[in-house]
Amino acid sequence: VPVLAAGGVATGRHVAAALALGAAGVWVGTAFLLTDENAAHLTEGEVEALVRSQATDTVISRAESGKPFRQTRSAWSEEWAAPGAPQPLGHPLHDVLVGDILGAIEEHDVKPLAHSGAGQGIGWFDRMRPVAEVMADLAGGAEAALDRLSAAHGPAQGAEQGRVPA
């Protein structure tokens, strides 16, 4: 059964590490947030929050929909996590409660409250780029890391037949 590695995969070295550990592939998410192709889905405030974020600037919050969601820290997530704040309702009730407010925050680009879903790999990205560049960096970085690994330790067992070791 093929296994995909997910979570924290942000660079070609991360891809290579997952493959070296036996994954058949990787699932990448955060690397594509700050891409030109995704720009239409982000406000200026969201882009600013993503660009300045490091791994420690993400939080798991239920303040968005009632379900746990990793996002960039904002005044919105901080207020919902503050002592004495009400507990978010479960999904979908919380979304009904705050959905219009979140829509207005996005529509009017209220920067202190702006946030975006993002994994802890967000710190690897500091600018908007085309998806083609992200893909080239992932593939090129993985290939270089796997070449270094192979040179240092020899090819993986089964690599000569083009198979990923089990």
Task: Please identify what each model-predicted range represents.
Residues P2-L4, A10-A166:
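Conserved active-site-proximal phosphate/metal-binding subdomains
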